[in-house]
Amino acid sequence: MPMKMGWRWYGEGNDPITLNDIKQIPGVTSIVWALHNKMPGEIWEIDEIQKVADQIHAYGFDMDVVESVNVHDDIKIGLPTRDQYIENYKQCIRNLSKFGVKVICYNFMPIFDWTRTDLFHPVGDGSTALFYEKDKIKGDYKAMAEYIMSFTEKYNMTFPGWEPERMAKLDELFKAYAPVTKEKLWENLKYFLEALMPTCRECDIKMAIHMDDPPWDIFGLPRLLVDEPSIEIGRASCRERV
């Protein structure tokens, strides 16, 4: 099967790159998208999806990959309330399938999504790049959150996984995750996927989990997908449509 080229787009008002800009890139036929205004656990409603679909289709793009439908922390922690959030996730899958979505990306990282210690690290040619320095993660998690959030305010955009609503609850989240071991996190991932698989089969949608980014424990939080053996554990846990 030939590789299909897609381009991630963060949506109107949240991405300086427009769909018209992306249209100029040779070979790109699909937009990797999401509803970035939705918090984890919320249902993506048909009319909300339709609005983005109209924008994407106006430029002749497909929209068959979503990144991401984020997973609520109650599911990752394994709280009794997780079942309702799983039902909401199933409804997201059903609604997205009506628009031709075939792949849903997600992650199972506790509290933080992707983490970098420098968003504008200078490189030799004068450009800048994202950068991660492991020793800086040994400090205060609040300092890291404040650093990332400073760019949210400066550029008037929201970084996925670093939404202000989540950052306001950091202390509360760290307390909730305190008893969650790596083994328990694996169990909770398995529970989540096994609950979703019948709906995924019904809707012909595959779930694509993102590797932990970076692939090391941070601030004492467990991480699952960090190397090749961990990927095999994930496959063994739930082989269908993953």
Per-range role (PLM):
Residues 3-8, 29-33, 63-67, 104-106, ...:
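Hydrophobic faces of well-ordered beta-strands that scaffold small-molecule active sites
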Residues 42-48, 78-95, 185-192:
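Glycine-rich anion/phosphate-binding loops
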